[in-house]
Amino acid sequence: MHFYGTIGPACADAATLRSLKAAGMTGIRMNLSHGGLAQHTDWLDLIREAGIPELLIDLQGPELRIGGLAQPLTLKAGGTLRLGQGGVPCPAPLVAAARLGHQLLLDDGRLLVQVTAAGPDALDCTVLRGGLLESRKSVAVPGLTVDMPTLTADDLENLQMAAACGVTGVMLPFVRGKQDILALRQALAEAGAPHIRIFAKIENLAGVQALPEFLPLVDEVVIARGDLGNAMPLWALPRCQKQLSAACRAAGVPFMVVTQMLDSMQTRAVPTRAEVSDIYNAVLDGAASLMLTGETAAGQYPVQAMEVLVRTARTAL
């Protein structure tokens, strides 16, 4: 099996990366939504120094995110939030598509707001579920299709650098159909990197429904449960994960399970029983890869989390 961590402040030193590798980590993910390869040459040097064989880059793709904030915002239930001109920066296509009454999930659903006024340049919202809103956090609108390009200008720039930086795989968020995969294949070819593997992230209903058409075109499918859980009632997510796993097994395409595998270990040294059961069952379902995100990028126990992930998964093999 393959075991991935995500690089971030909690593990961005050679000693911790070596410890993660010793714990069984086979590769590492770099989230390019928070800065490109050119901005993270220090991380690339650390990854090489630690001898980590696989480097996955997670592109921006058609994902919706707010822009940068001067400082985090504390949103309180019943309060207001403006998205767009004169407020929190957000993609113009989102402002154009959203309508009165739409509910927007922010930061993987941790925060929830409802549109109370939709203008040409901004959305005024009421906060239904508050919390701390930080820069570059995700936005999802269940049931709404927002027309976004497959690859951003930053994505294309990062793909040009990918081979020279030792990238072995590219994760494409919010895959909607085979055209997204074909666009990425073409961009990799034009960058002189046709050998780099493609990981298709399933994060919305369009991706779920289109899976059969693009399965033959990808190297691995990523069942990304964060945003996928925003696209449906949470109690429907386990069934969806099982169905995606079965489809990948039937097609002979490897798949990865990711998001909140050991979320409690961001702040606790010991996982919950539910978390280790989740890992074990993902392996029984046939997962070829498992990945930690915030647990290694920002958590207090990155190495311990990787040890739990690897030991639990290997017990299931």
Show the residue positions of the predicted features:
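Non-catalytic helical/linker scaffolds that mediate oligomerization, partner binding
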Residues: 1-317
